[in-house]
C-alpha cells in the first residue's frame, strides 16, 4: 500500500506526497507551492522521484519550476497534454495505464473534463488523486467544461470500487456539507458524517482521504437520483426536473450562489 502524506499549502490546498514500500523517494501531486515540498523533502531526507499534475491552475502547478531547478530538469512531470503546462515533460493525451518512472507504479489515467478542459485523475492501487474534480461532499466549479462533461466525469469516478480512497486537492469539506444539508437535510449518512468532519477539523485534522462509498452516500453531486434532492431542486428553481444532466447543472448553479 502507498504511504501518502498531506502537505497543507495556501489557505486550503493539499499537496499529496506518496511513496511505495519499495521506493526510497517520493512523488508529489499538484505542487502549487514548491517551498512547502522542498521543506518536507529536506526534513525527511527523501529524494523527489517525480510529479503528477491534474490540471493547469496555478495553485496546482506553481511549484514545478522551483522543484525542477532543485531536483533536476529531467525529473518526470506528468500532466494533461492539452493544457500545455510549463514544466510538464511527460504529457498525457489519453485514458489508460502508464508506469511512473523511477518508482515503477502502474497508474490509471482518467480524463475528467469539467473543472478545466483537460483535467485528469490518477488512480494508483486504491488511491485516487482527483485534483479539483471530486471533493468530499462536492465537486469543482465549471471554469472551462460543460455541465454534461462534469456529470459524465463524476459518473465515471462513481463507478470505481467503493473502497477507492479519494485524495482531493482542497479542504472544502465543511462548506460542502453545509450546502449538502440544505439540499438533502434528511440523509442520515450525511448527518453522521457532518458530525465526524466537524470533529476532525476542530482538531485541525484533514477530512481526507474520503472514499467512493462515502461520497456516494453523502455527496449530492453523486446522488442526483435522490428523490429528496430532486424535490429540493424543483422547489429551489420552480421548474420540473427532467434528467440527470439538468439536475447536475441546477445543483452546480445553486452551489455557486450558495
UniProtKB/Swiss-Prot annotation:
Pfam families: HAGH_C, Lactamase_B. Binds 2 Zn(2+) ions per subunit. One of its GO terms (biological process) is methylglyoxal catabolic process to D-lactate via S-lactoyl-glutathione. Zn(2+) 2 binds at residues 59-60, 132, 170. Keywords: Hydrolase, Metal-binding, Zinc. Disulfide bonds: none annotated. One of its GO terms (molecular function) is metal ion binding. Signal peptide: none annotated. This is Hydroxyacylglutathione hydrolase. The lineage of its organism: Bacteria, Pseudomonadati, Pseudomonadota, Gammaproteobacteria, Alteromonadales. Its EC number is 3.1.2.6. Gene3D superfamilies: Ribonuclease Z/Hydroxyacylglutathione hydrolase-like. SMART domains: Lactamase_B (SM00849). Belongs to the metallo-beta-lactamase superfamily. Glyoxalase II family. Zn(2+) 1 binds at residues 55, 57, 115, 132. Monomer. Pathway: Secondary metabolite metabolism; methylglyoxal degradation; (R)-lactate from methylglyoxal: step 2/2. It catalyses: an S-(2-hydroxyacyl)glutathione + H2O = a 2-hydroxy carboxylate + glutathione + H(+). Its cofactor is Zn(2+). Thiolesterase that catalyzes the hydrolysis of S-D-lactoyl-glutathione to form glutathione and D-lactic acid.
Amino acid at each position: 500500500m502507498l504511504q501518502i502524506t498531506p502537505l497543507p499549502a495556501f489557505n486550503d490546498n493539499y499537496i499529496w506526497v506518496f511513496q511505495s514500500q519499495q521506493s526510497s523517494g517520493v512523488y508529489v501531486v499538484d505542487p502549487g507551492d514548491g517551498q512547502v515540498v522542498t521543506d518536507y523533502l529536506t526534513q525527511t531526507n527523501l529524494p523527489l522521484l517525480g510529479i503528477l499534475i491534474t490540471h493547469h491552475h496555478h495553485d496546482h502547478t506553481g511549484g514545478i519550476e522551483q522543484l525542477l531547478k532543485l531536483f533536476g530538469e529531467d525529473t518526470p512531470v506528468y500532466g494533461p497534454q492539452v493544457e500545455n503546462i510549463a514544466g510538464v515533460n511527460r504529457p498525457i493525451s489519453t485514458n489508460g495505464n502508464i508506469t511512473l518512472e523511477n518508482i515503477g507504479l502502474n497508474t490509471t489515467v482518467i480524463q475528467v473534463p469539467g473543472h478545466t478542459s483537460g483535467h485528469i485523475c490518477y488512480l494508483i492501487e486504491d488511491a485516487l488523486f482527483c485534483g479539483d474534480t471530486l471533493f468530499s461532499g462536492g465537486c469543482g466549479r465549471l471554469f472551462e467544461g460543460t455541465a454534461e462533461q462534469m456529470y459524465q466525469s463524476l459518473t465515471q469516478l462513481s463507478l470505481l470500487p467503493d473502497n477507492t480512497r479519494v485524495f482531493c486537492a482542497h479542504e472544502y469539506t465543511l462548506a460542502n456539507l453545509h450546502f449538502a444539508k440544505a439540499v438533502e437535510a434528511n440523509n442520515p449518512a450525511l448527518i453522521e458524517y457532518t458530525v465526524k468532519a466537524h470533529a476532525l477539523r476542530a482538531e485541525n485534522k484533514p477530512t481526507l482521504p474520503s472514499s467512493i462509498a462515502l461520497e456516494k452516500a453523502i455527496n449530492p453531486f453523486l446522488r442526483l437520483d435522490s428523490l429528496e434532492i430532486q424535490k429540493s431542486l424543483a422547489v429551489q428553481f420552480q421548474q420540473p426536473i427532467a434528467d440527470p444532466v439538468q439536475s447536475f447543472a441546477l445543483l452546480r448553479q445553486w452551489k455557486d450562489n450558495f
